[in-house]
Amino acid sequence: MKEKFVVTGMTCAACSAHVEKAAGALPGVDSAVVNLMLGTMLVDYDPEKVTAEQIISAVESGGYGAKRASDVKQDVHKEQDAALAKMRRRLVWSIVCLVPLFYISMGHMMGLPLPGFLTASHLTHAISQLVFCVPILILNRSYFTVGFTQLFRRSPNMDTLVALGASAGLLYSLIEMVRLAAGQVSGMPELYFESAGMICALVTVGKYLEERSKGKTTDAISALLALAPDSAVVKRNGVEATVAAEDIRKGDIVVVRQGGKIPVDGVVVSGSGSVDESVITGESLPVEKAVGDPVTSATVNQSGYLELEATRVGADTTLSQIVKLMEEASSSKAPISRLADKISGVFVPVVMSIALAAALLWAFVGGQSVQFCLSVGIAVLVISCPCALGLATPVAIMVGTGKAAENGILIKSAQSLELMGRVNTVVLDKTGTVTEGKPRLTDCLAAEGVTQEELLCVAASVEQPSEHPLSRAVTEAAQERHIPLCEVTDFTAVPGGGVHAVLHGQKIFAGNGTFMHQNGVDIAPFSAQSEAWADDGKTVLYFAEAGKLLGMLAVADTVKPDSAAAIAALKRSGCRVVLLTGDNTQTADAIARQVGVDQVIAQVLPQDKAACVERLQKEGQLVAMVGDGINDAPALVQADVGLAIGAGTDITIESADIVLMKSSLADVASAAELSRAVLRNIRQNLFWAFFYNSVGIPVAAGVLYPALGLLLNPMIAAACMSLSSVCVVSNALRLRLWKPKTKPVSSAANTAAIENIADNDNEEEPTMKKTVTIEGMMCNHCVAHVEKALNALPGVKATVDLAAGTAVVEGAVTDEAIRAAVTDAGYTVKGIQ
């Protein structure tokens, strides 16, 4: 089982490494991953071999505090805010004491006057420095208590380095002051009180800036948590009462009025309303909800009145699960961070050894003074920064997963985030992924003497009693065009063939070609067009009255508006795109042509999809699988990265590494783009961290002193250390500016993309006047609809003739733009002259 613990007392990457080592050493613990920024640890353990109490005890034995996250009632983010405010107060008072300390100790070097009583005696001058230094050390005593505690436990951390550096300066200065008081020193000795105080103050400045920056990395999680309402209205025993949102129980009836937030997942049992689901699905338009419809936590009832039965409450709501996924992802570790983790575990002992070795070498080999050697040792201790190494990866991952969630992409682990950027083959399921997963009417061809409106009226009327998906596609098309339907009698469905019924006393047949032949209907006049539709992967339905063919309709699972653009973006990024489907080859090839997929694997049984993915992996491909159905789950697990379309089934989403909440294929390309951006950021952070420590430590040790006479002052070293962590975190925060290059596009834009797939370079020069032949217009309402669509194009003036079935378009516009606009309006362009 996996359980989250809240860990206190960690200050750097070395701390998190020690905590992970302590918990991971217990028998029965499979993995322990610490999130330094959130102060949490996610442990995967066998409860039969080890208990949560033993895990807590192991962490506490290492000098840190630990509690089960379920036992911590206070909001972690509020605790972080309180800790930041406390650190700010500590910093302010440290600076208040540091300014006079710096003036007293260093002012005379700058020609600044000192009070007479300080210049009268060297001892008075030294004591005054001590007086202002001690409050700074007391204010920042945590560096010493934690640092030395961890040193004695043989798990030194960054606090240990600061404590050793400041203590060395303080101890040397105290000894020199005692010698001065005893008269053993003539003149003013070299003291390091200001260095000890400055080191603590500057490190606190850096930690404060770092904590502020780290707080911004969790803004996405905080924003999600803010979506949940604090209270709700519950109806119990017929009486309404306001209760805290966390007190809602499963089965409670929750009342949500206009403008109210829905606090839990549930099902509408009374009322109706328009619900804004954009925070969860990204859908910009409100969704109508009525009795029986599901609703999701954190969504807003924009209008109407809803009563819903709570089905998922507390930690089980959709919002809570999203937050949990984000926290788990930010707590996980990417493979790219392994080297940094290994170095962080031994970094502090190595630095302590380098500091001691440098001081001894300068003393015994270089023949330098004690003050020189002490300055070198302190500088090495305080310039080194394990935090820069430890923060290089997690801050980028946390910002990246948060940014992904803002765009409707839920990434479950850092490993998935890293792998998505390295994927070179994307396998797409067809139905519900590339296509809408719902048949729609695409074409209408009426026989001579029959209008399209008449054909559609007859077709929808006879299909209305049927529950078949193709029948529903026909009736929905008629309803969208506001065509009135007629009642039929003697309705009969013939499995595998079609339906027949009586309309206005005439027997109507509707179905496939075989069904028509069986009932003596001649479909030969339409055979050429029906074959063309079939080649495009469409299902052809014929309609006949009293043995005479009225016309035919084509129904198909239409391509999603952004599929072509998304696939084009994937191909531009160097990915090989494969369409994997159980559908027949003809239909699969037709869809592939529309969206620009070059490789199709069709007629694959559900149980064989995983084998197809495995075969691609054996070819050396890093494979991402995108699907939405239960039959896609094994393939999602087999793939290096599994992506589930958000509208899919629970089992598919559970099997996936990444969940696309908007059900948009464009988000596959966006996930890959974001992953690559995060990887770039991590590499930059790691380079800076390694470069800083690789250069800073030798310089502090004095390697430039023999040639250039350059020796780093401990105060400057402390400032550099503070800024190094801030630089890493600030660089990661740049990811907050990331925006997806590939966005969901309109149907018009998608149609234009499809038209251009065959020959992207074949763009026509715009002409001033064109005549467009349009199919599908049946009334003046259609005329107005088409004119509005065409006139919306920039610089275009269009006039539509219903009788001729044409539109005259004037203006500088390409054929592709005209086709896109007309098709988006729901009609078909047959030709442009």
Tell me the role of every PLM-derived stretch.
Residues 98, 198, 346-347, 374-390, ...:
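Small-residue-enriched core segments of transmembrane alpha-helices in multipass membrane transport
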Residues 89, 299, 421-467, 497-578, ...:
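ATP-driven catalytic headpiece of P-type ATPases
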Residues 54-75, 127-231, 235, 246-254, ...:
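Actuator/coupling domain of P-type ATPases
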Residues 1-124, 223, 238-240, 320, ...:
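Flexible metal-binding regulatory segments at protein termini and peripheral loops
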Residues 17, 38, 503-505, 539, ...:
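Conserved ATP-binding TGD loop and adjacent catalytic N/P-domain core of P-type ATPases
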Residues 76-96, 146-169, 323-355, 373, ...:
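Soluble-to-membrane junctions at the N-terminal ends of transmembrane alpha-helices
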Residues 230, 280, 339, 388-462, ...:
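Conserved catalytic phosphorylation-site environment of P-type ATPases
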Residues 110-124, 152, 171, 403, ...:
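Membrane-embedded alpha-helical bundles of multi-pass transporters
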